[in-house]
Amino acid sequence: EIWEYAKADTLKGEYMLRRGKDALKLKLKEGSMRIGQKNYTVSKLTERTLPDYPTKDESDFLDNGNVGGKVTLRGRIVNVPKGHEDRVSISIPDPLQTIFDNELPIECDSLGRFELDIELANTGVVRMLWAKLILTPGETYFISMDGQTGQTFVMGRDSRLSNELLTHDTPYYKVKSSDFDKKSDAELMEAVEKDYERVKEIWMTTEQASPMLSKRYRLLSRWQWKMGAAYSLVQRRYDSPDVRKSDDGQLWQWLRDSVFSDIARPYTLVQDDLAYTFDNYTSELLKPRNSGGYSFEFIEEAINIAEERNQADKDSLAILSQSMNDYRSKVNGGTPDSLLSDHPFHALIRQMFANGTPLMQIIKSTEPNERILLKNIPRVRDLDLSEELKQLSQAVAIYSQLEQMHGPLSDALRKVLDETVMPPYYRDRILMRSKYFADLAAKMKRGNGCLMPNEPLADLKDGKEIMDWILEPYRGRIVYLDIWGTWCVPCKANLKQFTKPLHQKLRDLPVTYLYLCNNSSDKAWASAIAEYEL
């Protein structure tokens, strides 16, 4: 609890504290403290974090089954670090988000004190300035932070693990998948095993030096390394065609045996990277990589939609489909990429999916993605995963589609959601996000942006010519140019995280902000600029 000083005699070490109508006497002297009528032996904290706890703790993590619950945070932050003066916040990973964390502002009074309630699905990790905290629904925590000294303490019944993490940082996965862009999966997995041997040494050294570290610390340290490795490894889905052909299943088998068959309990402990990692892992199981680099399933759905709606010449669509099937059979048959570089399928893709074509308009609508999703969600039931992870996979897939569409649930997705078994917390998160986009659409104002007409640019092919035409009205001004798309997840992450701080930092300069969005539907574009306040 936070108490106010009513009286203070620092020379005698005597204090009177008040909280509402309650009063408390406090007397301090070297090595002892008297609170009310009770005496305590104390020692002054001079280090940045607490020393190791003197007793063993073999308790397990509390798992509430992802029903959600409130966590109360109280505390004081002094000497706020540079760059955070205008906004101190707490970052809460969302178990269904593949990229964004939820950030909540912390309102401090003139003395740096704060009180905040947050909702968590389950026991999990949050970040507050430089501190990584483990919080459990139903608990109250008091946090003391000093941005100048870095001194950080957490108090409360469930504070031990947070203090241990502040004192003993956990080792992270250090293999860069990008260093293996032209190497086989087997070579990458050899590097993973070497990194595992490295962290085993760190764990052994740390636990020998600090034998009282809790069981929960030991478990979390291992789970976090494995999830860091998994997050990096699943990105092999996007590597070069040559790498894709080297896939012997070893990488995906390791993920199954070492990560998803022995995942953290509760898995919200590793939710920082879990949604993205798991989404890619299940996508690989449902739609394995191919060495051709194309999403044939996606192209097929776009062709099907165009045929159903008579939005493109049927003969042209038939030629594209026939060429794709020929190309796909050669890819699956192991034909070297060098012999496929002149295949007519490449030219057909460039021609029929160019800007302004019917197929490109269909892609912008995100409808092909939704059709694939509707087919794949039932297929998740057949995957070799625990029931808990199957439900997570389905929830992440639906939530990710909302983010991709930047709009509310379609009728088809809502029907699938109603028919899919998942924890109520997941369902509520999806429905809340859908309502958010629906409300955003209802109050959207188009005054912040305008559609660029295609006609003046139709005959321009050179990139410099196109950019000169776009920038001509702003010549002589300072222009900040950002090119993005509603389909581009990193673009949207940067817009969400950096737009407001950038505008604030440059507020005294005569800057014109120009955000160019391409290959995106009008609806998704309008929704995104409203959300990010562009």
Segments predicted by a language model, with ranges:
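A non-transmembrane, solvent-exposed segment enriched in polar/low-complexity residues
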Residues: 3-216
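Conserved redox-active cysteine motifs that mediate thiol-disulfide chemistry
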Residues: 475, 483-501, 520
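Oxidative protein folding and maturation machinery
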Residues: 149, 156-472
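Conserved helix-turn-beta segment immediately C-terminal to the redox Cys motif
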Residues: 477-478, 495-517, 530
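Short, internal strand/loop/helix patches
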Residues: 362-363, 526-534
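C-terminal substrate/ligand-recognition segments
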Residues: 457-460, 474-479, 487-491, 505-506
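Acidic, polar-rich low-complexity tracts and alpha-helical solenoid repeat scaffolds
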Residues: 53-60, 68, 442-455, 508
